[in-house]
Amino acid sequence: YRIRNDPFLPDNEVLFFHTLQQNINVSIEGDLLNIYPKLNGNSIKKIKLLLSVIIKSVPFEPKISDLKKAADIKDDRTLKDYLAKLDDAGLIKLLMQNSLSMKAFDKPEKIFLANPNLMYTKEPNIGNLRETFFVNQLDNYYKNKQLLNDDGIFASKNGDFYCEEKYTFEVGGKNKGFEQIKDIPNSYVASDDLEIGIGNKIALWIFGFLY
């Protein structure tokens, strides 16, 4: 997953993580300040702390009170605003309930890192890595196509993801079945370690061509 998405592909792991950290700093200290010039040094510090908390936990269903405490943020509104800004910066992906949800005001159903590369700041769980890869590819597809207000992938009550508010996806390994989504129309399984899909079971790597 990392190699398929690398923008720099270094041979040296130390260089990889150093470059990764530099890109994160540029996104927060440069890009965000250009977009939101009213952000001050304390806000930037809190946003960095919030991202470090998220990196240690993703993907996860956020508890607002726990995130506020961990990132030393006083109120819900500020936390949701900082989360939305990290999403704007392309560092995290807020998975909302549906297209009517507003990232700056509503609680996200789940938080992902926007790119699987960021997961390599710690030892990633393979299941989390698969889901993050899937979210990354679909999210970039919708943004590049400028479809559905740049947001076409949502949390699903039955499967893992709900795309275009029509297609339900479960993401898993080669032996992942349809138990959770067997009675749902337009439902699919995206399977890792699968060379060629069959029927409604799609090889996960295929989604890499959407980027």
Where are these regions (language model features)?
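A short, acidic, amphipathic alpha-helical segment used as a generic capping/interface helix at domain edges
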Residues: 152-157, 174-176
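Nucleic-acid nuclease catalytic cores
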Residues: 156, 186-198
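Conserved catalytic cores of phosphodiester-cleaving nucleases, focusing on short active-site segments
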Residues: 134, 138, 159-173
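Hydrophobic beta-strand segments of well-ordered beta-sheets in folded domains
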Residues: 165-168, 185-189
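Domain-level recognition of nuclease-like catalytic cores that cleave nucleotide substrates
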Residues: 195-211
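Structural motif
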Residues: 170-174, 191-194
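Active-site-adjacent loop/helix micro-motif of nuclease/hydrolase catalytic cores
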Residues: 125, 174-183, 198-199
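Accessory nucleic acid-recognition modules appended to NTPase machines
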Residues: 4-155
